[in-house]
Regions:
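Hydrophobic ligand-binding cavity/cleft-lining segments
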Residues: 1-42, 138, 143-144
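Short, surface-exposed coil-to-beta transition loops
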Residues: 3-5, 58-62, 82-87
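Generic structural detector for well-ordered beta-strands
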Residues: 7-11, 38, 54, 63, ...
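A short, structured loop/turn motif at beta-sheet edges
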Residues: 11-15, 42, 65-70, 89-98, ...
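A generic structural motif
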Residues: 32, 59, 69-70
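Short, hydrophobic/aromatic-rich segments at coil-to-beta transitions
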Residues: 44-52, 67-75
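Helix-adjacent hinge/juxtasegments
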Residues: 57-66, 75-79
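Beta-strand/loop substructures that line and gate deep hydrophobic ligand-binding cavities in soluble
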Residues: 76-128, 133-135, 144
Length: 144
């Protein structure tokens, strides 16, 4: 199972960073291609909650595996081109938060797709999206 490890720093408290991370209505602000999130079965802070993330016409059913505010959030996701488990931790570091993301993909199609998204830090790459998220969390912490 291919594994991708990413990290970024946000000059914002872990609680605020975690809360932004699980705000499904705002996911499109840092995850490229997300057009909507539907079919939410409960609170994303509850293990077992399900929802569907849409990338245009393609859906990615998702289930919450772990939600430990403000420290850790994990989901299993899956579409026909990318599926696996994403676990993100939020650790206090100085005056901010170290965000560490581990994505384990499943299947050969996911392996190829994930490899493309894992290269570099361009907008739309895994690292690029995490960097965008960290900057957004900092703007939110600054009130704006």
């Amino acid at each position: 199972m291919p594994t991708h490890r990413l990290t970024a720093f946000a000059a914002a408290p872990p609680e605020a960073v975690f809360d932004l991370w699980i705000d499904l209505d705002r996911m499109h602000e840092w995850v490229r291609g997300v057009t909507k999130v539907t079919d939410l079965t409960g609170s994303v802070t509850q293990v077992g909650t399900r929802y569907v993330t849409w990338f245009g016409p393609m859906k990615s059913p998702t289930v919450v595996l772990e939600a430990d505010r403000p420290r850790r959030f994990s989901t299993r996701f899956g579409s026909r081109i990318l599926r696996g488990v994403n676990t993100t931790t939020f650790e206090p570091e100085g005056s901010g938060t170290r965000i560490s993301e581990v994505m384990r993909t499943e299947g050969w199609v996911s392996e190829i797709t994930s490899r493309l998204f894992s290269l570099g830090s361009y907008k739309g790459s895994y690292q690029g999206e995490l960097n965008d998220f960290a900057r957004l969390a900092e703007r939110e912490a600054d009130g704006g």
